[in-house]
Amino acid sequence: MNRLFKTIIENNRKWVSEGKVASYIPELSKMDKNLLGISVCTLGGEEYWEGDAEVKFTIQSISKIVTLMLAIIDNGEDYVFSKVGMEPTETAFNSIVNLEAKESHKPINPMINAGAIVVASMVAGKDSDEKFDRILKFTRKISGNNNIDINLNVYKSEKETGHRNRALAYFMKSTGALKGNVEEILDVYFKQCSIEITCKDLARIGVMLANDGVSPYTGDRIVPRHVARIVKTIMVTCGMYDASGNFAVHIGIPAKSGVGGGIVACAPRRMGIGVLGTALDEKGNSIAGTKILEELSKQLDLSIF
């Protein structure tokens, strides 16, 4: 299996030159553009990895599936989806267009920034510190890694330059789509995006989802089955931003990307996959990481369609 991964990485390294690291968050622009790694966890508890699978990077938008799971567990799916939609979008992940165009002003799905900010507001906790503490502990739980922590430099960079996210949040506050203290909610959001993980962590999160919310290592149920199902479905329809349809056709498995270069994916009842490729395409997805998943999906016949 490791030989296969090594071959797939080398086959797709050429795509790195066509992408760029995220530059709108200054701290992310310091990332090495050439990082490329993959990790896979099977339902039998076997782990394989190749390349830069142990390099730490920030989770960014992959945290949106973490907070979505937690918000549904805390509030129930009916309440969560009364505040945020579940439809795909053709606009960019940080766009304000749909918030203005829709009569309800409700964010169109939980995987775009506006939707994720609303979801963060629904995580239970008496204040922003308690909310984030629960998110961090939940991330550690679903990945089986108690050493996961926040990258404070990225957090500060996000907080200082997150003007678009502030605009989205204050617009939603003005329409009633977002309840609570905007700056406290944004603080939770900036912190959740700054959690530092590796490909190995993502693969373990992926395999938990592939196993319908049960850890293949301990046999313990970590996430209710219906929550895992909802999140996997949203990952298919919305997880790769406005490239989700293309990803579904060519790769065909639930996945969620982040501008840190990571992608978490799962092949239901087979495996979890974590990929890192810091060079991004124009949609904000890892360009080589996507190509690696495409080749892996074809080689192992992973598509659910």
Curated annotation (Swiss-Prot):
Disulfide bonds: none annotated. Substrate binds at residues 61, 113, 158, 165, 189, 241, 259. Homotetramer. InterPro entries: Beta-lactam/transpept-like, Glutaminase. NCBIfam families: Gln_ase. This is Glutaminase. Its EC number is 3.5.1.2. PANTHER family: GLUTAMINASE (PTHR12544:SF29). Belongs to the glutaminase family.
